[in-house]
Amino acid sequence: MLFSVASLPLSETPLAADVQFAEPSPSATILPGIGRNDDRQPVNPADFPWRALGRVQTALGSRCTGFMVGPRTAITAAHCLFRERTRLIIQPRLIHFLLATSRGAAAGVALVADFTIAPGYDPFHESESAGADWAVLTLSAPLVREGEYLRLDRTLPPRGTPALLGGYSKDHIEIIEADLHCLITEQIRDARGGVLLHHTCHATSGTSGAPLLFRLGSGEWRVAGVQIGSVVDHAGGIAVPAAAIPTSAIGR
């Protein structure tokens, strides 16, 4: 999904006032969320944290990014589970999760057995319910072992937190590309009061569902948020805070 940001809203400013879903100009040559300078670089899918990422792929041809939070549990953006034109839900049996896939080879592949979409997410009113744009996937088989998945952080990261974000972009769908040097800049709100994180990470279409990552002082990687959209015409994007996803939804 795409956002148009006229001016970055402050923490208590409703999302609908300044940040709206928008379509890019047909003549635009700048990728949404990238801008004129592309800071993305390929990363090794065998390295952590990237080996916990995967491509969420439907039989209808749509693709997003997701990440493992348990042996057979993954998270992605809720809008990835709806048909783009009709907004009808896509059945789990039509969705695959390809773990750490790169140039046609994946570390593991599983069907989605079931999924849970966040209460309050409305595919017909995406911008108003953007703070609920997350979903938990239950896979048909375990793809990772204990300790090989990512953990959600339960706090809201402060402004200026160093971050990184990688995923399967539409312009390079066979590899993980990541911006390794970006920042979480603001906490904003959608029209229904849902909290969102604005960041400066270079990421475009296809990365929806990717983890917005930061590192604890101990060196442990944590998920600060779930990427849900890119900013039109320049670098940056919007993520749902990981803290918005209840522990009960992922079973831990």
For each predicted feature, which ranges?
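Chymotrypsin/trypsin-fold serine protease catalytic domain
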Residues: 131, 139-202
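Cytochrome P450 catalytic-core helices
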Residues: 72, 76
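C-terminal cap/linker of serine protease catalytic domains
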Residues: 145-148, 170-171, 224-252
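Extracellular/periplasmic catalytic domains that process cell-envelope and extracellular macromolecules
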Residues: 46-49, 68-69, 88-91, 127-131, ...
